[in-house]
Amino acid sequence: MRRPAPYHRVAAIMTILSLAGAGHQARLDARGGMLTGPTANLAPGHVQANLAILPQAVAGDFLRFCQRNPKPCPLLAVSEPGDPSLPELGLDIDIRTDVPRYRVWRDGKLVDEPLDVRGLWRDDLVAFLIGCSFSFEEAMLENGLPVRHIEQGCNVPMYRTNIATHPAGPFSGPLVVSMRPLKAADAIRAIQVTSRFPSVHGAPVHLGDPALIGIADLGRPDYGDAVEIRAGEIPVFWACGVTPQSVVAAVRPEFCITHAPGHMLVTDLLNSRLAAF
């Protein structure tokens, strides 16, 4: 007769299933058109991912681009050509429907922002899922660090910089950064906290004067929403997974699909599993 599993094992399994269910529910909401906005602080504890979908003919070059630029493009998963599933990231993922909002690019021009891309799917498309800073924000909040765009209920501000990425094949372009304002002491703590998560951008790439990295006006982000910067705070900048979108605009591949900035794929992976130490 098979003996029942010890209580602690059953409890652990149920906890894992419950946590995975939160990510799965977020994807179902996106798939059903009920989730169409930014995903910051959604399904707490879950890894979120940026998306870039490209034809197989240029997928190898883009893979090398990600490998050469691990700060803005830390790869979490790569699909098989034509396969919209990503079983390593979660139950029943369909990358054509499970992102709240997509961007469609043709010859480097943004032509649409649909809620699903089933009608555009092709057998030669390869999906790249890239780590997102929304994942380390959980650790920031747990350490008592403020995250302004969550406080204000808006999207994180993102900016194109004058920092060049390392090219691979046709892919090259400017680094995009996300910004969170912090007091100096909190910025030091944020460096310590986010350094533990290299697979979701890790430590900041710059803090202080935005002009040094080519940002003229923090009140006019290239992507996302401007946030309040209070007295005594400095802007802190992290490499951002929207970088491929600035590269797409520069390189102009014939076809590409990305997520809309701030509108991520919510996975079943847990943020705690990404901590390097």
UniProtKB/Swiss-Prot annotation:
Highest taxon above the source species: Bacteria
Enzyme Commission numbers on file: 4.2.1.-
Pfam family, one: D-Glu_cyclase
MF terms (GO), sorted A to Z: lyase activity
Keyword set, alphabetical order: Lyase
Family: Belongs to the D-glutamate cyclase family.
Annotated HAMAP family: Hydro_lyase
Protein's name in the database: Putative hydro-lyase BP1875
Organism expressing this protein natively: Bordetella pertussis (strain Tohama I / ATCC BAA-589 / NCTC 13251)
